[in-house]
Amino acid sequence: MNTGQEADNEVIKLEDAYKIYPMGTEEVRALNGVNVTFKKGSFWAIMGQSGSGKSTMMNILGCLDRLTKGRYLLEGEDVSQLDDDSLSEFRLRHLGFIFQSFNLVPQLTVQRNIEMPLYYLGWDSAESAERSRELAINVGLGDRLDHKPTQLSGGQMQRVAIARALANNPQILLADEPTGNLDTATGEQIIEMLKELNRNGKTIIMVTHEPDIAENAKNILYMKDGVIERIE
């Protein structure tokens, strides 16, 4: 039985989690009864072949999709019971996202891209500007605030994406192939940034297909055919 302290330390918990997609007369079980707990301050890598369920799991963890059945507890809240609007707000307040393709808005400056989550949270412009400048400096882009994504290198764009993910000060960062579009040296720099964020208390869950990248995490979860094959 979990103690209260252990329960408080659980930031994400999937219980008997299924995600089933109809495929003609058949069904595909992208998640097939998954049970896993991610604790506060942990750093996880999720690995698996194409079709293993790792991307589906990240979509569920990011509140971008819903379970077919089972429970998803996020910071103690059963998000599987929330309506769409409540789920969107919960996602905005509790999660930060880092994508392989950066997902920056090309028409906006670095500063405006970083500010986007704050806009949706209703921050005023002065507070948003101060927060975005602080984050840009923290990721080494204080002199690039007025640049647009097309004027940046891949590594710089991923730094902007990390700053944007941190804008709402989430406790959990979800990183989907964060080094996938970067050269080796730049990828290592991004991983070092994630490790530093983890040392400062952020919980990080990262999907990667690169074993050498996964080895930077404290735990590695291997998916196969919609189930957890093993955890190292």
Describe the residue ranges of each PLM region:
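ABC-family P-loop ATPase nucleotide-binding domain
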Residues: M1-I20, E229-E232
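ABC family nucleotide-binding domain
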Residues: E10-M223
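H-loop (His-switch) and adjacent beta-strand-loop-beta switch element
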Residues: I220-E232
